[in-house]
Amino acid sequence: MLDFKGETLNYDLPVSLPKADMQSKEAIDIYQLIIHAFTEAGYEYEYNEEEKCFVFTREDDELTYTFSVDVGLVSGDGNIVNWLGVWTTIEDEDFETENEDKIYTTTDDGKLLTYEEIFSNAGSIIQIVENDITEEFYDEKRENL
């Protein structure tokens, strides 16, 4: 459970997350923040056991947005990793495009970002995909017609 901006975040986390992550308060809090950023933007989420990632999906009138966010926040030395990989797919019934990005969790020298910064990083990726990458999607689709 995490108090963040006046809200209590308590999203369900799968018990199959890496053991080191489940034993780290910071890792659990970061997962809560990432899930919160996506659910606030209208995404539903599930955990993909086979791929070991969170999958966030939202459909609008024409497009389906799917974000896959890696897990494994705690490194072998017990510190929080610098970032989590994010793979995005935007598709409609005729066409699909993919994008790769990162949600940063620490500074380059390993200092944990503030929870506001981590939440903002996740939200920024959503905005970039929904605006810039969607525009690229339509441009690429037009070129392929």
Show the residue positions of the predicted features.
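General "foldedness" signal
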Residues: N48, T57, S68-D70, D132
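Intrinsically disordered, low-complexity regulatory segments enriched in Ser/Thr/Pro
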Residues: E62-S124
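Negatively charged, low-complexity tracts enriched in Asp/Glu with abundant Ser/Thr
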Residues: L2-E62, D139-L145
